[in-house]
Amino acid sequence: MLLLLHRKHDAQTDAYGLYLATCSSDKKVKVFDISDNKKPLLIKTLEGHEGPVWQVAWAHPTFGTILATCSYDKTVIVWKKGPTPDDWTNIFTYKEHTSSVNSINWAPHEFGLILAAGSSDMTASVHTCITETRWESVKIEAHNVGCNAVSWAPALQNRRFVTGGCDNLVKIWKLDEEAHKWINEHTLEGHTDWVRDVAWAPCLGQGRNIIASCGQDCRVIIWTQERDQWRRKELSRFRDVVWLVSWAITGNVLAVSGGDNNVSLWTERENGEWDTFSEVNNVPMPQPLPPTSLVRSSHQLAAAKQLDAD
């Protein structure tokens, strides 16, 4: 199940469910051992940011145990675990953004160790690991006022990712392999206020591209690509700002959370309409900027509840 974690800005488990990383406004990132399904054991506190830490993101285990973090302090940091649980090293720091870095997302591992980030300085950045000590970074002029969210497309196609911004737009970016530059392939209009989150759906067995976006305008929009065009379908209007959208790994269930402290699950019916089939009400949730994140597994939620109880 896709559920919500309160109090922390973000919490993510690694691919094997061995570690849980959390971050918050105390500038710290905490890594817990959750491998025994008992009380989470704090094994490392990562300190390096100088402001609230908004998001954490685990890289694919192909590359080792690697965690990326982003912060209000305008930086992105990539950490790697050594041979012992408490041995963590900062292997990359990016300081070229001029405002808060709000969102990070790793590319599919088939493309290599590549991280995208979105910032309030109106840009997105893409960071490619050549070696652990050498990274190549590029900035893209993405959204007027600021970029709130980034999400990569599945690896079944060329390198693409989607961004959402304070200009009310959703933009799709494609790598021009010959020119070695990112180009704005599509700009999707439909929101009437800031886009708070975007999520490109996994395409297991679907054979089509689907993106979910949500915003300050209380809307959730499902974008489906048909040939070179994107078709828009809006879910039923929500009562409050919608902070987050998150797909199940199968790509056919969407979790939505917002300012009304509710989390709802949606799926597409055979007639193409989207319906909600489950809802959790009155989930305590602060509203930082960026907003809190969805926990992506019940294992993660159980660990988080134990942390909050301490």
Labelled PLM ranges:
Residues 157, 180, 187, 206-211, ...:
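Terminal intrinsically disordered, low-complexity extensions flanking WD-repeat/beta-propeller proteins
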Residues 1, 37-42, 84-90, 131-136, ...:
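Beta-strand initiation motifs
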Residues 11-17, 57-64, 105-112, 151-158, ...:
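Loop/turn segments within WD40 beta-propeller blades
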Residues 3-27:
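Beta-strand-rich domains and repeat architectures in extracellular enzymes and scaffolds
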Residues 7, 16, 42, 52, ...:
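WD40/WD-repeat beta-propeller blade-loop signature
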Residues 2-8, 46-53, 94-101, 140-147, ...:
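WD40/WD-repeat beta-propeller blade N-cap
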Residues 29-33, 56, 76-81, 104, ...:
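WD40-repeat beta-propellers
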Residues 23-26, 69-73, 117-121, 163-167, ...:
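Conserved strand-to-loop turn within each blade of WD40 beta-propeller repeats
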